[in-house]
């Protein structure tokens, strides 16, 4: 019996091997190679991929979402090109990168109104475009593809295997891809940064927890953005109403966990703001929630080092967010272009990737560090509504405006520190 079964056993083994081989052959190749691999197709990643591909480099983009830009996880606020010149005076590329095609602009604003805990109001000029972030991000990715980049959607970066290999998974299994240059633009959860030992998620206090509703039937001035402060509203952060267009607004807030109550849910903070704030409820009293989203925003400043021999970190993965206001689109676009150029210079000319860090520090480093200094100053003030209100009234629009623009006037720093020393012991 054993002898008679041998041909059958051999045939079954052969059939199984051939079946597995045919399955592997019908699937995508599990081992890939490119000149440049970009993890993440947000503004930083797509811009880096476009620049690299346009330089003639084979470029692979790995994006975890099925649709680029969805869900939207920001207030969709982007300063105008003119404002970019003021915000980043050492960055020659900023105004050009902020020149968004008109079809993606849903509203244009020219003023900002700040509301203190006791509802004192301060207004100043600041021009911004409110964009359709989902459509804009999708366009940025399509521009990268148009220049030759290979975009892989629904693909999750798992980490790095060695200095030049990225491991990722999709519906067909696990794959690895090798490249001469790797750009980690995969957000504050960055697996690329984690593989380098520079993961941003190590310290929760370096993150802002944010939640946002898109609301319809909002009673608003479409020309004005509103920012609300108060420990009960948004501990360690602020709330916002950003008009997307006629009667539609992004209404949200960001908090810092170390200042918040462990028992209060993030959604509870936002609902309380929408329903109870004396000023906000006049805008949102008849409004309806169309959609909601939550996100993590890195506010701990840039990671210590954003490059290694063949890896660069860009955008949120590098901590490149204006810490005092949470803005990250401008720096992501700037990072992306510099990273794409650095990849080309590295591969074609042998220039070390340290050029990437030298360049972004020159163009945006001062502003990123100043924003972090302002946040640290605010951390001493925001836990007390009395102190926050007093500081805002003392500063007035004249000095609050540069703070929102991420500049720290000397009189503000001196006055704020003096008030903190005098009032904190009795509050």
Please report, for each region that a protein language model flagged, where it lies by residue.
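Extreme N-terminal leader/targeting segments of oxidoreductases
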Residues: 5-9, 13-36, 54-55
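Glycine-rich FAD pyrophosphate-binding loop
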Residues: 41, 53-73
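N-terminal Rossmann-fold NAD(P) dinucleotide-binding loop
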Residues: 45
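Predominantly flavin-linked oxidoreductase catalytic cores and closely associated redox partners
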Residues: 55, 67, 145-280, 303
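N-terminal FAD cofactor-binding segment of flavoenzymes
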Residues: 65-112
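Short beta-strand to alpha-helix junction loop
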Residues: 123-143, 191, 258-265
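FAD/FMN-dependent oxidoreductases across multiple families
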Residues: 259-342, 347-348
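C-terminal helical "tail/cap" subdomain of flavin- and related membrane-associated enzymes
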Residues: 341-427
